[in-house]
A protein has these predicted regions:
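Alpha/beta enzyme core
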Residues: 1-113, 127-150, 182
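Active-site-adjacent substrate-binding region
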Residues: 116
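Thr-Gly-centered strand-to-loop micro-motif
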Residues: 119-121
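C-terminal alpha-helical cap/extension of soluble enzyme domains
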Residues: 125-190
């Protein structure tokens, strides 16, 4: 449930309704709180260093605690320094600026929420930063930009869907190894 653009009370109400419905049907619920930079081109002209320093848009600890307690969501996507992929058509094929994660903030969010944290905008982040994030509470990492660009680049170069699929498979295996989650399917997927 992405209610991140809603006011806190409205996000809580919407997410709680979805989580209650999902749980009644034995389905887990992921929710989002905070403003991940770069979504649909937003923040493209903002200075990343200033945002990181001030934590503008980062998931607030008090709000995260309240959100997790009241919504009973199973996973919480948090804003901790990552940048959403190049979603807007005009920047679709551009390399993302290199982002980093506020590891201390991740650890604090993990403590106050007590639930697995999700990282949107995981493509292009330094691998050690990702590993540190995992060690401090990140349990799911979205890397859609990396996967999509691999597919589109290979398809554009070869005009062969099967080669593009094979390139995605290879890149996905590389990412799994780099995140050190190889062999964790049961743990990750239940």
């Amino acid at each position: 449930v992405d209610g991140s653009r809603l006011k806190l009370a409205e996000n809580i109400a919407v997410t709680k309704q979805v989580a209650d419905f999902a749980h009644a049907n034995d389905i887990a619920c992921e929710a989002e709180l905070g403003s991940v930079m770069g979504h649909e081109g937003a923040g493209a002209n903002m200075d990343y260093e200033e945002i990181f320093r001030t934590k503008k848009g980062f998931t607030d600890l008090g709000e995260a605690k309240q959100f997790a307690e009241e919504t009973k969501c199973d996973w919480l996507s948090v804003a901790v320094g990552s940048i959403h992929g190049a979603i807007a058509e005009g920047v679709r094929n551009q390399k993302k600026p290199e982002a980093r994660l506020d590891i201390e903030h991740i650890a604090d969010l993990s403590k106050v929420t007590g639930i697995p944290l999700v990282l949107h905008g995981g493509s292009g982040i330094n691998n050690q930063c990702i590993l540190d994030g995992i060690a401090n509470g990140i349990a799911k990492i979205n890397v859609g930009t990396e996967i999509r660009q691999t597919y589109e680049r290979t398809l554009g170069e070869t005009n062969d869907v099967e080669k593009a699929r094979a390139a995605v498979y290879t890149r996905t295996c590389e990412i799994i190894r780099s995140f050190r989650i190889e062999g964790n399917q049961e743990k990750l997927c239940g």
